[in-house]
Design a protein with these regions (language model features):
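Short catalytic/signature loops enriched in Gly
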Residues: 5, 80-84, 154-157, 250-322
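ABC ATPase NBD Q-loop/coupling interface
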Residues: 17, 70-98, 136, 254
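The feature captures the beta-strand-to-loop junction immediately N-terminal to the Walker
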Residues: 42-44
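P-loop NTP-binding/switch modules centered on Walker-like glycine-rich loops
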Residues: 58, 189, 193, 197-279
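A short, proline-enriched helix->beta-strand linker immediately N-terminal to the Walker B motif
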Residues: 182-186
Length: 322
């Protein structure tokens, strides 16, 4: 039996109006997520990773325009039947009240800015359950305490009454994960969830998300520039460059048999503890200015293997996995 596709992004195209002109930030994205799968979207800052997933949860800035595309979400309607909805066609109110948090939840990179400093931890976890699940307060409180224990926070009763500033960075990120899980979503989107944490805590948070994924049968999307995170958690990898996905494959094939020169460059820039080289490889040049639509391969100017045709024609998507 084939895996069920729970999220499908088709030909997504997004631009932003700026004082300098129109920035064509997302240029025809296609991406699939299967039930229970972990997919990573990896690329440099500004490649369009976060914008792609913010479109799915209705968090694009007001100057954004969705020019084309679909984001199809498939879920059980409660009667044993699959229902598919295009998230881009929903009103902001419908997306906020029926889907965000309840079916799709997002964990952001900086837990301090994700939490309300004026509200206790407990109230912030309960908020989603009261809004989406319409739970009685006593039941929501009990569930919030259970979630704190699930994400590895000891002395849950005490922490329930704490404010964000009273917790360490690692504990705050655990709270953010608890909030994301409070309405029992199908899909968890993690946007650089460990960037603001030290290396030891990073590993613990990644292990925690994996454990919760298996326990709650979640599908997870990681947005990251950290290939170490990708190697640890991902089943499949989508490599993004200049608003496009340029290579797709499972994690082993991407790491050991990369096809696109940009993917090769990213991997070459990773530190290797087995070599004595003091100098890290860096990809020459800078990403293109998307105020001006790139002609041909957007990576050609930075690619030492580029041919004449690369500056004239856009290459096809590199798919490593069959």
């Amino acid at each position: 039996m084939s895996a069920k596709t729970i999220l499908q992004i088709k030909n997504l195209d997004i631009s932003f109006r700026t004082n300098a002109g129109v920035v064509h930030a997302i240029r025809g994205i296609n991406l699939d997520l299967q039930k229970g799968e972990t997919v990573a979207i990896v690329g440099e800052s500004g490649s369009g990773k976060s914008v792609t997933m913010k479109a799915a949860v209705g968090l694009l800035d007001s100057n954004a325009t969705i020019n084309s595309g679909e984001i199809l979400y498939t879920y059980d309607d409660g009667h044993g039947q699959d229902k598919t909805v295009d998230l881009l066609k929903l009103s902001k109110k419908q997306l906020r009240t029926e889907y965000n948090g309840q079916r799709l939840a997002m964990v952001f990179q900086d837990p301090m800015t994700s939490l309300d400093p004026t509200m206790t931890i407990g109230k912030q976890i309960m908020e989603g359950m009261l809004l989406h699940k319409h739970m009685p307060k006593d039941e929501a409180r009990t569930k919030a305490l259970q979630l704190l224990e699930l994400v590895g926070i000891t002395d849950a009763e005490k922490r329930f009454r704490n404010y964000p500033h009273q917790l360490s960075g690692g504990m705050r990120q655990r709270v953010v994960i608890a909030i994301a899980l409070s309405a029992e979503p199908d899909i968890l989107i993690c946007d650089e969830p460990t960037t603001a944490l030290d290396v030891t805590i990073q590993s613990k948070i990644l292990d925690l998300i994996k454990q919760i994924q298996q326990k709650m049968h979640l599908s997870v999307i990681y947005i990251t520039h950290d290939l170490g995170v990708v190697a640890k958690v991902a089943d499949y990898v989508n490599v993004m460059y200049a608003g496009k996905i340029v290579e797709v494959g499972n994690v082993e094939e991407i790491f050991y048999e990369p096809c696109h020169p940009y993917t090769w460059g990213l991997l070459s820039a990773m530190p290797d503890l087995e070599t004595a080289d003091d100098r890290l490889y860096s990809i020459p040049g800078s990403p293109p200015n998307l105020l001006h639509e790139p002609v041909g391969d957007a990576f050609a100017a930075r690619n030492r293997f580029a041919m004449v045709i690369d500056k004239k024609a856009e290459p096809p998507l590199f798919t490593v996995s069959a």
